Amino acid sequence: MDTSRKNRIIKITIWVVCSIVVITALLAAAAFFWPAASKQLQSSSSEKLSYNDAIAAANRTVSGDTSNTDVRSECRSIIKTHGKKTAKAVMMIHGVSACPQQFADLGDTFFNAGYNIYIPRVPSHGLTDNKRHGEITIPAMAQFMNSSTSIISGLGDETGVVGLSGGANMATWITQYNSQTISRALLLSPFYQPSASETPSWKIPLLRNLYGRNIFPDSFTGSNLSYRALGKYIIIA
């Protein structure tokens, strides 16, 4: 092989290696520094509804769950009212991979105390294949939070929201962007980020950006929580 050809091969090899290094560095930088904010989460599009409109919207949600054979019967959205707008109403948002059943007993306690209650099913949750909670999307989460806030707005003169785990992340967002509607928030074990014992802090941007934005294929924790879903809840936080 002549010298000039060897030199060309060496140059091409160096160029390829350098390109791979640069691309890898850019991907790594994107994974760590990609902004967490998402356009759909920068404002709320909820609206204040009358009691009748809120009930109609809630009933449509429950009917949709009832007619959807993929939704487990115990996981349908729950609406319980006293037949009129009450002084206080509360919305409860379940945790990651759970469903409205998680708050059924607490909902009854509030209802018996005179509250109207609404416990909506988070999109992609409560399905016969529970691993499908990993299919949830940021637009679906934003639409869910906005429509649920609209419904609770018509159920009470004073409204609050209770959230557990990822549901507490949603409750945080709802309260932040709907302060004219929501006056109380109870946040139970919010999943703002994994505990240090479970995930080193340097891995959190990877979970948020690579799994939360569906760049990596989904994986599941030992307790069958979707990494993609967890990443999206961190984005909300």
Region locations from a protein language model:
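The alpha/beta-hydrolase serine catalytic core
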Residues: 43-71, 190-237
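Membrane-interface motif at the C-terminal end of an N-terminal transmembrane signal
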Residues: 23-40
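Gly/Ala-rich beta-loop-alpha elbow adjacent to hydrolase catalytic centers
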Residues: 162-167, 171
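N-terminal Sec-pathway targeting helices
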Residues: 2-23
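Conserved hydrolase catalytic core segment
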Residues: 173-183
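Short, surface-exposed "cap/lid" segments of acyl-processing enzymes
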Residues: 71-122
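Catalytic nucleophile-loop/oxyanion-hole region of alpha/beta-hydrolase
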Residues: 127-160
